[in-house]
Amino acid sequence: MLKPLENRVVLRVKEEEEKSMGGIVLTSASQEKPQTAEVIAVGEGKTTNHGTLISPLVKVGDTVIFEKFAGTTVKMDGEEFLILKDSDLLAIVE
């Protein structure tokens, strides 16, 4: 499993529906990149210049919305994950 460093989080991106609302099957080129994901792992946080540790606000299991082109995609054990900084997260879905 991946263990993110500092203020990074590991996400499992949720696949979007491959059909339009009208039932038309979309090609991968016409689909927008998904922006919703499940948090799989969370780093310990980032240390400020004054030595204070600032922990990420998300926890494992949270569903989040992230910036459209954020992060780095990594494949591990046949599965694809996205690693990004917690500042690239926009919201927690409740």
Swiss-Prot record:
The keyword Cytoplasm applies. Gene3D superfamilies: GroES chaperonin (2.30.33.40). GO terms for biological process: chaperone cofactor-dependent protein refolding. GO terms for molecular function: ATP binding; metal ion binding; protein folding chaperone; protein-folding chaperone binding; unfolded protein binding. One of its GO terms (cellular component) is cytoplasm. It comes from the Bacteria. Coiled coil: none annotated. CDD domains: cpn10. The keyword Chaperone applies. Keywords: Chaperone, Cytoplasm. It is found in: Cytoplasm. SMART domains: Cpn10. Together with the chaperonin GroEL, plays an essential role in assisting protein folding. The GroEL-GroES system forms a nano-cage that allows encapsulation of the non-native substrate proteins and provides a physical environment optimized to promote and accelerate protein folding. GroES binds to the apical surface of the GroEL ring, thereby capping the opening of the GroEL channel. Heptamer of 7 subunits arranged in a ring. Interacts with the chaperonin GroEL. Belongs to the GroES chaperonin family. HAMAP family: CH10. This is Co-chaperonin GroES. The lineage of its organism: Bacteria, Bacillati, Bacillota, Bacilli, Lactobacillales.
